[in-house]
């Protein structure tokens, strides 16, 4: 009888009382046997065998397994568990590598934190449109079903991107970039249905932070692992492998190619003209090398965001049930306390609205309160009322989140509805003030922007009121998209030209007695077509001189604007053409 045991061969002879074990030390005073790697002293006629029970006609064999041998045998019989890879790249994910790198280059070159309206133009539009198309195509090829939000958001982004090329919204520049930056981050998680509640909700802030920080960090290495990881034929085809090698070659060789082109352009005028005039290349080796270098971390981030959004499971990092339970445990404000505060505040609102109504009736009748002017009345308290409206939104949110849940909900709804209605009344007072201000002193962008914001607040409080009657009404979602739609429409309205046209026409018709035409100098280049048209058609020499002076002031202030083809902007280009026609300095 023979048996293999942990690299030892044990031979057992059943006719004798002696068992010999290979590689074991035996100490025996009678007829004893020591088993596999152990010293056993025994005074009887027993045989100890490692891991085996042997019965014999004359002797009893006791089996005494040792811990070390059991562990070794058990380990040797186990099949190693293969660790599941963190990333499972498909052919489509590999193809996205050069696409994302191109997007990163365009972002760094034509749309970055240092880019203002002086350089925002065709390049920024190209980057944003390609970004939207790339994300949508990537999702479509991954068999993702688009929801209505992803379509609406994509359309809004493209429209806002077009405004970068068509209009010169200098006064909206900062707001446009803030809105676009938010949507650029928010788009992938919307398209790939990775929002916490599968749609824009009250958790929009967490959804944005998740897209901005958590998903890119969790997938920070995906760009490089996808680029350099070894793949078998089962994971990538030969064509994909060649495609990746070509991309790597271009990525590594681009700086050297640019240096060669620069040197050849310097050596031959004809060669230089080919790139200068045919392709409009602006060869700046240090700048473009720096752009390529900065494009790598940007590509790493964008790929982590887009690819991570396609695979990330939000349930691992955010549990909605746990969140709701935490919020239930966090409530501590008795509703009676909220009712008391809201009742007192509403009383003050009613008193304030009554006083303003009396003032407004007097103003419509042609009389002003003592020691008041139109401008003082219109300006006084305008932004304070906007702040009050925002405070009311915060109050309503706190009331709904932190109030005790097991109390009667009926009275809370009544208080929220009352607060919202009075806030709408306060906004109406603000509208009345703004109307008086504009009709007396004309339009400015700083009067249009708050007016549009007030319209947005009207939508918000109207949605809040509806939400109190219909529990499933998506207040946050509709407010978010109402705000975005209003803002995009504002950007497409070319408000700087609208302001100049309204003021100039009203001034020439005698409807703005307090307006100073020299205020046109504060306009931007979007106002140049309006000024040029009035200058060209007017026969009043004094008016023409004033308009010429205003146009010189505008173009003198914006004379530093660049004129690159990739930074083309229709309004800016039109303004420079008008500058030539008006012979401006």
Model-predicted regions and their roles:
Residues 2-3, 67-136:
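N-terminal signal-anchor module of multipass membrane proteins
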Residues 113, 125-272, 295-313:
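Transmembrane-helix bundle segments that line or gate the permeation/cavity pathway
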Residues 262-276, 353-368, 428-436, 499:
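Membrane-helix interface motif
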Residues 279-293, 370-387, 443-453:
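Short aromatic-rich membrane-water interface segments that cap or initiate transmembrane helices
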Residues 342, 346, 473-496:
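Internal/C-terminal transmembrane anchor helices
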Residues 418-467:
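Membrane-embedded alpha-helical segments of integral membrane proteins
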Residues 488-513:
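Hydrophobic alpha-helical transmembrane segments in integral membrane proteins
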Residues 520-585:
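Extracytosolic and intramembrane catalytic regions of membrane-associated proteins
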